[in-house]
């Protein structure tokens, strides 16, 4: 069993427990009190149309492949990290909510959404409509759909549920088959994960290959393995101006400063 299968097995157990604690109908009631959605897709599309880099900066404490990423001796303050990202040029924020494998938590997303005027993505492994409603109740402006764990009809149902709640959808692919499936969705946001989620091997060439095969009107978003301004410049040459970056920003303990350096900006 690879790591992705383990994660999805855990998610099935997690969702079953949560549905037993709070019904989907009760969650929908909570949605009424959630802050209104901010334009996640618009924040990225508007920058890309102007030839400007749009970064989804990720609040990421750890991962299955790297263990703890954010330095252990520093206080963990997700809202402050997200605000530092915003101040240093992030277009959007991504927040991991998976506890078991990525050291995330729903409360991190809630804290970020309450404190930061920036669209927020719930980064998790979604497969059930319950998780979509849950994302909106937490204040998410967008959700991630990973085609490696979803069949096309399932992804379409989740996308429709998200849109009904006013959220945008970022669909993530890693190969040609997944891209073909993703083209069946309506969202313009196409994330290309340079990291193979089954082996965790990273190759930035994946972004070049798949972006070239995308339908017109889709926005390629390069994810994982982006470490230097040169990486971004190479992708810019191929017409890619949108990125999801986390690990390389979090590792040094000053995520906002690391983002500013990556974007060639003055650190705020």
UniProtKB/Swiss-Prot annotation:
Cysteine disulfide partners in this protein? none
Which catalysed reactions does the entry list for this protein?
A: 1-(2-carboxyphenylamino)-1-deoxy-D-ribulose 5-phosphate + H(+) = (1S,2R)-1-C-(indol-3-yl)glycerol 3-phosphate + CO2 + H2O
**A GO MF label:** indole-3-glycerol-phosphate synthase activity
**Uppermost EC category:** lyase
Gene3D superfamilies given in the database record: Aldolase class I
TM spans, by residue?
A: none
Question: EC number(s) in its UniProt entry?
Answer: 4.1.1.48
Which UniProt keywords are listed? Amino-acid biosynthesis, Aromatic amino acid biosynthesis, Decarboxylase, Lyase, Tryptophan biosynthesis
Q: In Gene Ontology terms, what is a biological process of this protein?
A: L-tryptophan biosynthetic process
The source's superkingdom equals: Bacteria
Functional pathway: Amino-acid biosynthesis; L-tryptophan biosynthesis; L-tryptophan from chorismate: step 4/5
The UniProt entry, under HAMAP family, shows: IGPS_B (MF_00134_B)
Q: Which family does it belong to?
A: Belongs to the TrpC family.
**What protein is this chain from?**
Indole-3-glycerol phosphate synthase
């Amino acid at each position: 069993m690879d790591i992705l299968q383990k994660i999805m097995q855990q998610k099935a157990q997690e969702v079953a427990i949560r549905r037993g604690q709070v019904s989907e109908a009760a969650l929908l009631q909570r949605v009424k009190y959630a802050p209104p959605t901010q334009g996640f897709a618009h924040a990225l599309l508007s920058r890309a149309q102007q030839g400007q880099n749009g970064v989804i900066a990720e609040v990421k404490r750890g991962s299955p492949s790297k263990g703890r990423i954010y330095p252990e001796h520093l206080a963990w303050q997700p809202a402050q990290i997200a605000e530092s990202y915003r101040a240093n040029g992030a277009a959007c924020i991504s927040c991991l909510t998976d506890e078991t494998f990525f050291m995330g938590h729903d409360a991190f997303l809630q804290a970020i959404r309450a404190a930061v005027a920036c669209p927020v993505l719930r980064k998790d492994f979604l497969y059930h409509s319950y998780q979509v409603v849950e994302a909106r109740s937490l204040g998410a402006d967008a959700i991630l759909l990973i085609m490696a764990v979803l069949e096309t009809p399932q992804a379409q149902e989740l996308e429709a549920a998200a849109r009904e709640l006013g959220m945008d959808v970022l669909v993530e692919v890693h190969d040609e088959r997944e891209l073909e499936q993703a083209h069946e969705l309506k969202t313009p946001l196409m994330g290309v994960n340079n990291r193979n989620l089954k082996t965790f091997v990273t190759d930035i060439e994946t972004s070049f290959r798949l972006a070239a095969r995308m339908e017109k009107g889709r926005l390629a978003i390069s994810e994982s393995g982006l470490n230097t301004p040169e990486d971004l410049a190479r992708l810019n040459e191929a017409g890619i101006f949108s990125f999801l970056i986390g690990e390389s920003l979090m590792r040094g303990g000053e995520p906002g400063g690391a983002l500013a350096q990556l974007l060639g900006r003055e650190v705020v």
